[in-house]
């Protein structure tokens, strides 16, 4: 099953065409690496794939649901905001700067979005967060604050936070 399809994606900033007719698909269980020199469009492609940046033209499909497509003039048109919010539940991001909230424990960092954004049950979210911490191996650090963690532990906490969504 294809989780993500990007077809004929184009993106320009001023006179600089950053993405030039890029197409790719990612199937369930597949691992994909995007490699290139600085300024080659890697981050822009990921930002377009995750709806943080709009494409000039192209098609974006998650699990068969179209998030964006071209109109008759060849410009990208996006689905309604309510549909995009549903689609955004399919993915989470971990940035180079992990941005864990410094005044929250690791556990609270993981639980915050599922509780506030998804309005999920606190006991259910707590159980899931602890399971994620166990898998990510900083389970003994659930009460620690980001400044008390190594960079690797911060990264794993951030990955657990993304997976919790």
Please report, for each region that a protein language model flagged, where it lies by residue.
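ABC family nucleotide-binding domain
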Residues: 2-165
């Amino acid at each position: 099953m294809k989780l993500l399809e990007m077809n004929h994606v184009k993106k320009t900033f001023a006179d600089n065409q950053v993405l030039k007719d890029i197409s790719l698909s990612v199937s369930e269980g597949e691992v994909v690496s995007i490699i290139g020199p600085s300024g080659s469009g890697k981050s822009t492609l990921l930002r377009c794939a995750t709806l943080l940046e709009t494409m000039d033209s192209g098609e974006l499909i998650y699990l068969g649901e179209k998030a964006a497509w071209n109109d008759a003039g060849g410009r990208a048109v996006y689905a309604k905001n309510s549909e995009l919010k549903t689609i955004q539940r399919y993915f989470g991001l971990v940035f180079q700067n992990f941005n864990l909230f410094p005044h929250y424990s690791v556990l609270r960092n993981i639980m915050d979005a599922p509780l506030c954004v998804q309005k999920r049950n606190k006991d259910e979210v707590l159980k899931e967060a602890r399971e994620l911490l166990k898998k990510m191996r900083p389970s003994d650090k659930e009460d620690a604050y980001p400044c008390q963690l190594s960079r690797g532990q911060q990264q794993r906490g951030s990955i657990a936070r993304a997976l919790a969504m």
